[in-house]
Design a protein with these regions (language model features):
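PLP-dependent amino-acid enzyme catalytic core
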Residues: 1-316
Length: 316
């Protein structure tokens, strides 16, 4: 009765990345930078390219070559210089950092990161306002680099500092990661303060396939601070969750959102979330950006002749 989906699949480029990208590129424009760019698993590529186009700045995207075609097409449509790196996200991230330093480019999630993360705080601001300034009991956040979870915590803390919220310390943060790229979950379950990188991520949730999460240690601190948990889910559980959300709420999410929903189900089954708790589940991207992941489990449409009798027989 108290489950809420924070649906960021309806933003300008159909993911939450419009929030941090918009802030970072606005600051790049303010600083007088001549070009911007990003290292990306897909969604940030689209968002950075779109906001750069609006700002009139050249954009350079560095991304693994195996991300979803829809995300590549989006970034290219906005006019980005798209560099498909034959390697992992961490390889693309390393190269983007080096290029940014050597050529004076504002890489939004690297040398513009302090401004970039501020944009994601609005995920806390909006949820608080939409819940009539009540703090939810549980927040489930899909985690790649970990920057979003950390920013959400910061956003709630700032609202408490200006007396718009109370009892923020009572909320529980849950980090959701896909099996095959869950270094933060692994560290949490081992009660370790160090995140050991995953060298070769292997998951259908490509937007979360960040083997060496830049904010991983901060996420572990936030989980400790907010009595949280970290949990993972496999590809089948992700696909099942995508279909569940689509069929019950009419929201078609990409696999990252499926990770949130799948982990929610697990936490309820494990008794870590009570059915009476108020729960916010973050859905961070649109399913149309990653249709390859879901097509294999969908029933193929049956092609029929344009005959009213035959078609009427299959419409119950």
């Amino acid at each position: 009765n108290n489950l809420y989906i924070k649906n960021d699949s309806v933003n300008p480029t159909f993911s939450f990345k419009d929030r941090p990208a918009g802030v970072a590129i606005s600051k790049a424009k303010e600083f007088g930078l001549s070009a911007v760019g990003c290292a990306s698993t897909g969604n940030l590529a689209s968002a950075t390219a779109a906001h750069a186009a609006k700002a009139g700045l050249p954009c350079h995207v560095f991304a693994p070559s195996n991300i979803e075609m829809a995300k590549i097409a989006q970034a290219l449509s906005y006019g980005a210089n798209y560099i498909a790196v034959d390697g992992t996200y961490d390889d693309a991230n390393r190269i983007a950092a080096q290029i940014g330093d050597s050529k004076g480019i504002g890489i939004v999630n690297i040398n513009m990161r302090s401004h970039y993360v501020e944009g994601s705080k609005t995920l806390a601001y909006e949820v608080a306002e939409q819940l009539d300034w009540q703090v939810p009991d549980q927040l489930i956040v899909p985690v790649g680099s970990g920057a979003m979870l950390n920013a959400i915590c910061k956003g709630f803390e700032e609202l408490e500092q200006v007396s718009l919220l109370n009892n923020v310390s009572n909320m529980h943060m849950i980090a959701a990661q896909p099996h095959g790229c869950a270094p933060i979950v692994d560290a949490f379950k081992k009660n370790s303060k160090e995140v050991i990188p995953v060298e070769y991520p292997d998951t259908i949730a490509k937007s979360l396939a960040i083997g060496d999460p830049g904010d991983g240690r901060y996420v572990l601190k936030r989980l400790a601070q907010y009595n949280g948990f970290a949990e993972e889910c496999n590809n089948k559980e992700i696909l099942d969750a995508i279909l569940l959300l689509a069929k019950t709420e009419g929201i078609f999410t990409e696999p990252a959102g499926g990770v949130s929903v799948a982990v929610l189900q697990k936490m309820v089954e494990q008794g870590k979330i009570d059915k009476n708790d108020s729960v916010v589940c973050y859905v961070t991207g649109n399913g149309l950006k990653a249709t390859e992941a879901i097509m294999e489990v969908l029933e193929k449409p049956k092609v029929m002749k344009a005959n009213i009798t035959e078609i009427s027989a299959v419409v119950n």
